[in-house]
């Protein structure tokens, strides 16, 4: 097993443990998944029906992990994903962020890639200035790529962010194998 595959497997196991915590009884697992799906559905509906903000998304950077690619490939790839998006978002009673979004940007091959989904982040305000915030969470959505004939591709990815007031720099990491995936993708999210 290569280092890249071990890293991917470690990340996958970590996020599966967060998303689907193990219970003492195997019989409780289906109820846990059902409860998680119900909460997810409720959060999506509440964000859609009762948003607090309208968001502008501006893609900022894609970076292909150099340890996971041949140099010839990374030399050809686009890492400036210009595009734009919009969304609706809210902060819940715990101070966590929920958002629905749609975005289109130029992918690694400089072709348009749309993405739409729901994102959630646990949010912390570690400084005395409450305008500064950091977050960790996930996004569930669907994308489509030119090199896959624009077939819809479901996704579950980690999210992280750092922000001040209405401006947030949000990011994800797309895991993969050698010469595929292993991409850091980040964007600016402005709340109005």
UniProtKB/Swiss-Prot annotation:
Disulfide pattern: none
EC number(s) for this protein?
A: 2.3.1.251
Q: Which cellular compartments is it found in? A: Cell outer membrane
- The signal sequence is 1-26
Active-site residues are 64, 107, 108
Recite the UniProt keywords alphabetically. Acyltransferase, Cell outer membrane, Membrane, Signal, Transferase
* Record site: Role in the phospholipid gating: 178
Q: Which family does it belong to?
A: Belongs to the lipid A palmitoyltransferase family.
One example GO MF annotation = acyltransferase activity
What top-level class of enzyme does the UniProt entry assign? transferase
Recorded superkingdom: Bacteria
Q: What reaction does this enzyme carry out catalytically?
A: a lipid A + a 1,2-diacyl-sn-glycero-3-phosphocholine = a hepta-acyl lipid A + a 2-acyl-sn-glycero-3-phosphocholine; a lipid IVA + a 1,2-diacyl-sn-glycero-3-phosphocholine = a lipid IVB + a 2-acyl-sn-glycero-3-phosphocholine; a lipid IIA + a 1,2-diacyl-sn-glycero-3-phosphocholine = a lipid IIB + a 2-acyl-sn-glycero-3-phosphocholine
Function field: Transfers a fatty acid residue from the sn-1 position of a phospholipid to the N-linked hydroxyfatty acid chain on the proximal unit of lipid A or its precursors.
- Enumerate the Gene Ontology biological process terms: lipid A biosynthetic process
Q: Which InterPro entries match?
A: LipidA_acyl_PagP (IPR009746), OMP/PagP_b-brl (IPR011250)
- Site positions per UniProt: Role in lipopolysaccharide recognition: 73
Its quaternary organisation is:
Homodimer.
Gene Ontology cellular component annotations, sorted alphabetically: cell outer membrane
Q: How is this protein named in the record?
A: Lipid A acyltransferase PagP
């Amino acid at each position: 097993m290569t280092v890249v595959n071990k890293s991917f497997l470690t990340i996958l196991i970590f996020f599966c443990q967060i998303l689907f915590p193990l219970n003492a009884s195997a019989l409780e697992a289906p109820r846990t998944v059902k409860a998680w799906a119900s909460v997810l559905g409720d959060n999506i509906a509440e964000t859609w029906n009762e948003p607090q903000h309208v968001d502008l998304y501006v893609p900022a950077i894609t970076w292909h992990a150099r340890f996971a690619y041949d140099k010839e490939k990374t030399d050809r790839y686009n890492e400036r994903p210009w595009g734009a998006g919009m969304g609706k978002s809210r902060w819940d009673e715990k101070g966590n962020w929920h958002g629905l979004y749609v975005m289109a940007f130029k992918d690694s091959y400089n072709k348009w890639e749309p993405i739409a989904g729901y994102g959630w982040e646990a949010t912390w305000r570690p400084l005395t200035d409450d305008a500064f915030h950091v977050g960790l969470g996930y996004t569930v959505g669907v994308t489509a790529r030119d090199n896959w004939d624009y077939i819809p591709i479901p996704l579950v990815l980690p999210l992280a962010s750092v922000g001040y007031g209405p401006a947030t720099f949000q990011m994800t990491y797309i895991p993969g194998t050698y010469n595929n995936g292993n991409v850091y993708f980040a964007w600016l999210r402005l709340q109005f």
